[in-house]
Amino acid sequence: MPSLCIIALFGTLTFYTLIPSIHTLKCVRCDGPMSNYDCKTTYPAAEECPSLSGGSSNYCSKKETFTSNGNLEQTRRYCNSVAAPSTACTDLKTGGKLCEYSCNTDGCNSVAGMEPTRAVYFIAILMLA
């Protein structure tokens, strides 16, 4: 009956991979002067986003401010109910630049920027079978 076990495992993994899980989005939250992290290179683990005044948090956001000579001055990471504009970076009156990014998977606003998705795990298990 090993083939029955493989079929059951395949069906379970397919269901888990294709059906989105119902849970609160988890984002890295490192925002404001009272943070214990500098947000540029160190940051806390992703946490569940609270409900915001505009509804649920559908996006993780990262906002970076650059000086006029191109140095990264400030980084903020937070939960957001709206996506960043399609033009990621805008010029500031000070000569610097403000770049905004948004994503909608757990921990996607970290320094690494990506975490493996369920599909990656699914493919890895299939390769082992």
From Swiss-Prot:
The keyword Disulfide bond applies. One of its GO terms (molecular function) is toxin activity. It comes from the Eukaryota. Keywords: Calcium channel impairing toxin, Disulfide bond, Ion channel impairing toxin, Neurotoxin, Secreted, Signal, Toxin, Voltage-gated calcium channel impairing toxin. Negative results: does not show insecticidal activity. The scoloptoxin-05 family has remarkable similarities with the three-finger toxin family commonly found in snakes. Coiled coil: none annotated. Contains 3 disulfide bonds. Residues 1-24 form the signal peptide. Belongs to the scoloptoxin-05 family. Toxin that increase voltage-gated calcium channel (Cav) currents in DRG neurons by 70% and 120%, when 1 uM and 10 uM are tested, respectively. Expressed by the venom gland. Residues 25-46 form a propeptide. SUPFAM superfamilies: Snake toxin-like (SSF57302). The keyword ATP-binding does not apply. It is found in: Secreted. This is Omega-scoloptoxin(05)-Ssm1a. One of its GO terms (cellular component) is extracellular region. It comes from Scolopendra mutilans.
